[in-house]
Design a protein with these regions (language model features):
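The beta1-alpha1 cofactor-binding region of Rossmann-like NAD(H)/NADP(H)-dependent oxidoreductases
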Residues: 38-39, 59-73, 110
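Canonical Rossmann dinucleotide-binding motif of NAD(H)/NADP(H)-dependent dehydrogenases/reductases
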Residues: 2-32
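Substrate-binding pocket helix/loop in short-chain dehydrogenase/reductase
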Residues: 96-105, 112-114
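C-terminal helical subdomain
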Residues: 180-183, 187-191, 202-243
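A short, exposed helix-loop element centered on a Lys and neighboring polar residues
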Residues: 128-129, 172
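Catalytic loop of short-chain dehydrogenase/reductase
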Residues: 104-110, 142-166, 171-172, 176-179, ...
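Active-site loop of short-chain dehydrogenase/reductase
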Residues: 5, 53-54, 81-82, 135-147, ...
């Protein structure tokens, strides 16, 4: 389905990003894992290569423009194109794991607020900024922005929810800017809380894992222009717009 496609997955070393890396590779894409956690990045890269999938990895912190610029140019120098960008890298509150670890607004430091916004929203912006020129040059491409958790209402989730709701708005604006270039931009919603491999055992027993997303990322990576600017979710083997 994605044979011959080059797919960048930010935050691709663990959690939902790791699952996306596996499913995109299984669908035939050459997956480029981008992560700040170098050890986990190489572990996931090894998993893909052990399965005989085409994969590569670049260490980068998506908060930093120079690192994002370097990463994108390294990918283009090696592969000559970028077909899919999955913006997954993010800082996530795990309230559904029973760990209320983030403070309410009155106790929230500006440094922490900045870290969440710069990673979740700023990283999505920077990766998109540097990838779209290469998609425009080929008049083709798919950008998938993870929107998971945007509906959270837990005390202490303000920074996260603000970043995710801003990503939906960002998706709509970039979709309109890139429409003439045939670049499809969607926000992808997992629909529910997901327990990844780092979750406590209790949470993994109670909540679904990333496998519940099925082939959602593969379908989102092939979304047509009729869906550009929309928030989509995986449902019964298809992706459907929810806004």
């Amino acid at each position: 389905m994605l044979q011959g496609k080059i797919a960048i997955v930010t935050g691709g070393a663990k959690g939902i990003g790791r699952y996306a890396s596996h499913t995109l590779a299984q669908a035939g894409a050459t997956v480029v894992i981008v992560d700040v956690d170098v050890e986990r990045m190489h572990k996931t890269l090894g998993e893909l290569r052990d399965l005989k999938f085409e994969a590569w990895a670049v260490a980068a912190d998506v908060r930093h423009e120079d690192e994002v610029r370097r990463m994108v140019h390294q990918v283009v120098e090696r592969f000559g194109q970028i077909d899919v960008l999955l913006n997954d890298a993010g800082i996530v509150p795990h309230f559904n794991w029973g760990i209320p670890r983030w403070p309410r607004v009155r106790f929230l430091s500006k440094d922490f607020w900045d870290s969440v916004i710069q990673t979740n929203l700023g990283g999505t912006f920077l990766c998109t900024k540097y990838v779209v020129p290469f998609m425009e040059s080929r008049r083709a491409g798919n950008i998938v922005n993870l929107w998971g958790g945007g509906r959270a209402e837990n005390h202490g989730a303000a920074a996260y929810v603000v970043s995710k709701d801003a990503i939906r708005t960002f998706t709509r604006f970039v979709a309109e800017e890139e429409r003439e270039w045939n670049v499809c931009v969607v926000a992808f919603s997992p629909k529910q809380a997901i327990a990844t491999e780092d979750a406590p055992e209790e949470a993994r027993n109670r909540l679904p894992g990333p496998e519940c997303l099925g082939n959602g990322f593969v379908l989102a990576a092939q979304a047509g222009m009729n869906l550009t600017g929309k928030t989509v979710e995986h449902r019964d083997g298809n992706i459907v717009a929810i806004d």
